[in-house]
Amino acid sequence: MRHKAGKENETQTKHTGRNIVIAVVVVLAAFCAYAAALVHSAMVIKDEVTQSVGVVRDSGIGAALAGSGQDSSMAGMTAIEAVAPQLQQHTTVARGQADGWVWRSASMLPVIGNDFAATRIATDALDTLASDVLPSLTDAANTMQKAGLANADGNLNVKTLTEVSSKISKSNDTLQRQVTALNEAPEPHIAQVRDALTSGKATLDSAASQINGVASTLDSLAALFGHEGTRNYLILSQTNAETQAAGGVVGSVGTLTVNNGTISMGQFYSDSKFDLTAPVTSTDGVDKLYAISRLGVSYGGDIRLASATPNFPAAAQYAKEVWARQSFGSNNIDGVLSFDTVALQSLLGVTGPITLSSGKVTLTAQNTAQYLSNQVYIDITDQNAQDAFFEESAQRIINGMLSGLNAHKALSLVATMPKLTENRHVYMWSFDKSDQKVLKKAGVVGEPGTDAQNPVTGVYVNEMGWTKTDWYMKKSATVSKTADNKDGSSTYHVTYTTTNTMTADQSTKLPAYITGTFPLGMMSDLVKQSGASDEEKAAIHAAMESLSKPGVVGHSIAIAKPVGGSVSNITVTSDSKDQIPALQSDFMKIKAGSTTYYANIACLLSPGATFTVEYDVKTAPHAAQLQLDQTPTNNLAAQVTYTDSGR
């Protein structure tokens, strides 16, 4: 019996061992099969993502979305329509692999699971671009071609505008969420995955940014012009020849009325036709940022100073109130739009050139900014004639933009506007709160930074010398990360440089209207009445004497603190023989609206001289890369360089 039992135990042991071996073999086989399936899936995804990126890169989609001119915009949409099916073939396969059980289970692995999760986000975003967003764009383009944004009588087709905006907006919102999630995903550990995602993210970021610009423009147009009933808008035309914080001094103002899609332009009035009014209620930003006003000298309501604050909603309210107090004004303004000379030039790329009524001047997409900011003061010396020229040019360009919006013009407009709003050449504001939400989301309202996690510092300039010399100012900036701090915040060093390129010879030969007409006597009397100390008055008087010299420009600088962050170590260096150190280096802390600024009285620049403002910024913990906002320049895009010296 014992012998028999022993044999049974031995047999059982053999069976158990064999079962273990079989189990191990099965597990190993399953693991090998899973690993093989994972490797195969990874190769498929890598190949399809790489090909998707190549299709987007080589197809000209980016150029189509960013192009200007009616022909290029339509050709771009045709290119998108042609390439979308090819792109979908690759993105659908990649997304199918990433959504399969093999890839999903790999996403749960410790450490490297994030690699697979990030890949799934990337394939989702690429497929959304190919299968949802691009078809929405081409569908919208086809809708505009068939129905048009303008009816046969030239009036705006409100139904088409809102329909097109809604289609693209929904797809864009999905894409932006996916791209944000992808950018927030941890960096992959596996080199092959990391390389594929790096290429894919760069392509997606570029396409998503351009698509967001198109969607934002359509949303903004729908918010302002897509209503039933009547809307009345004030139009500000700013001149970059005389810099103000939001762009340039307001040179002419007109109205635009939209009545169930029917657009009509009112008369434009030059700033010289405006009366100075008693102080208006919305002067906080203007009084605190315009240097003379900070000394206690109130200008009251002056339409030229509406742009002295970089917070355009406040500027719009100021302009609305000043307009209402003019003999030709009204109390029925629903919103305010603003265009500077760079914007007017870009819009002529949409509408085509115009020849002014004199027959002597043709404004084009190449010469308008220079002519309106500089040449006009040389060619037309009579101020009344200048005023008439500005009134006519602004009215005709803006009217040409909005009238007869066929598909070609509409597509060109939505391709042109994002760069203009991004760089503060165009602003849009409505006094309707529901519209404000749309416009703020679209990024067209021109506000200083409002989000601690997306920090923005600003450098804003108000010209104090009554000159038209800012066409000759060349500006550049650098933003360098210098440290990643223990609390998760980051420190940056900002450098902002301005050079007066006007030569000493030009300062004596150019018209005085350009080189300066500073009213020394009047301003001296105003300063005497101010609350400044005797020492301050002496420094200010010295500055005003310098501003009376031809070609000397005075820039009051306001630095905006990012929300949740701080600004420190502000310094100014200058080689200008007319500099007044006490006025350029003393930065007063002020608050206008919800923004904290540090502002000086003026940096004075002689012809050929340069000044540089430098300061440090600390962001809120765990914030994104610091961005620099600034008063728009004479170029479409500001010259800003971002570097990272903290790593």
What label would you give each PLM region?
Residues 2-24, 34-638, 647:
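Non-catalytic, solvent-exposed segments at the cell envelope interface
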Residues 642:
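Acidic, glycine-rich low-complexity segments
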